[in-house]
């Protein structure tokens, strides 16, 4: 992992007060120096959302809003306590160096929710969740809400990262699996097994899209009994989708979270996908 210090690379002045702020950063928990969980709360009543949707959060710098969208990891039923987001610090990024400098209690602007990446209602098939990096957040929200509703659905959760330390929500997911709190099979994988930071890793290796086919074979996941949801790196999303389509999954059974920065559309994205993403 790269040791990143936000303060050392960003000197922009964040405006602490602005009449357009409507929320507060109420809590933060660091996983390590470049991954953290943030909780942001609206000033008034919470805005309802569906598990899988995202909020856009930001601050004002020189009178202009600097903001980015992030999937919500907390359950909709707990929105009154704030919206949880799992975020990576991007060195030289536009927004995250600002976010990393904010103290708990800082004022922010939050808008949303947006997004169509939500569970199909009344779908009793196995849920295959495929994520890379911080793309696991919407799935955690879905599972948390399912538990609160008393209706958890059988799930297989593939989580791909570069380093073992990057596995967000690992204790939660391992706890659900080991204790039977949620009917989930959790399968993490690291893509750089030879790196010193992964010296103690004994689990699966390779990019998460590379294990989709083998896991389907091992667990008997087919187009008849499984619906897939994919979130994370755009190129990963398209590669994982291609594997599932090759295995006979219909397009309607492969759900994708499609937001990426304008001008950074992945190779292979269709015109309709790019247009749909822009609409978000």
Predicted regions: what they are:
Residues 63-71, 115-122, 266-267:
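Short, Lys/Arg- and Gly-enriched loop/turn segments at beta-strand edges
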Residues 138-148:
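Histidine-anchored nucleotide/phosphate-binding helix
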Residues 106-117, 206, 210-215:
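Helix-loop module immediately N-terminal to the HCX5R catalytic loop
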Residues 2-21, 158, 163-280:
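Reductase modules of NAD(P)H-dependent flavoproteins
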Residues 148-154:
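Conserved S-adenosyl-L-methionine
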Residues 6-104, 191-192:
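Ferredoxin-reductase
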Residues 132-136:
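Ser/Thr-glycine-rich phosphate-binding loops at phosphate-binding pockets of nucleotides
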């Amino acid at each position: 992992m790269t040791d990143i210090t936000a303060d050392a690379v960003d000197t922009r002045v964040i405006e602490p007060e602005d009449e357009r702020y409507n929320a507060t950063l109420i809590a933060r928990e660091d996983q390590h120096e470049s991954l953290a969980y943030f909780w942001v709360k609206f000033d008034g009543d919470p805005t309802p959302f569906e598990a899988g949707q995202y909020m856009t959060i930001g601050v004002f710098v020189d009178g202009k809003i600097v903001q980015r969208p992030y999937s919500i990891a907390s359950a909709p039923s707990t929105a009154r306590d704030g919206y949880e987001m799992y975020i990576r610090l991007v060195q030289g990024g536009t927004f995250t160096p600002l976010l990393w400098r904010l103290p708990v209690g800082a004022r922010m602007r939050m808008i949303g929710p947006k997004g169509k990446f939500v569970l199909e209602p009344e779908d009793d098939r196995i849920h295959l969740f495929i994520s890379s990096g911080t793309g696991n957040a919407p799935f955690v929200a879905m599972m948390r809400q399912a538990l609160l509703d008393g209706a958890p659905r059988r799930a297989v959760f593939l989580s791909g990262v570069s380093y073992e330390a990057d596995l967000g929500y690992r204790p939660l997911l391992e706890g659900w699996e080991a204790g039977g709190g949620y009917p989930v099979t959790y399968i993490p994988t690291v893509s750089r097994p030879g790196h010193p930071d992964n010296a103690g890793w004994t689990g699966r290796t390779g990019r998460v899209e590379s294990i989709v086919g083998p896991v389907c074979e091992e667990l008997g996941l087919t187009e008849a009994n499984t619906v897939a949801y994919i979130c994370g790196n755009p190129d990963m999303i398209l590669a994982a989708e291609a594997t599932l389509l090759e295995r006979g999954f219909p397009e309607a059974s492969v759900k994708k979270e499609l937001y990426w920065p304008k001008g950074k559309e992945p190779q292979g994205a269709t015109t309709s996908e790019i247009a749909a993403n822009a609409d978000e």
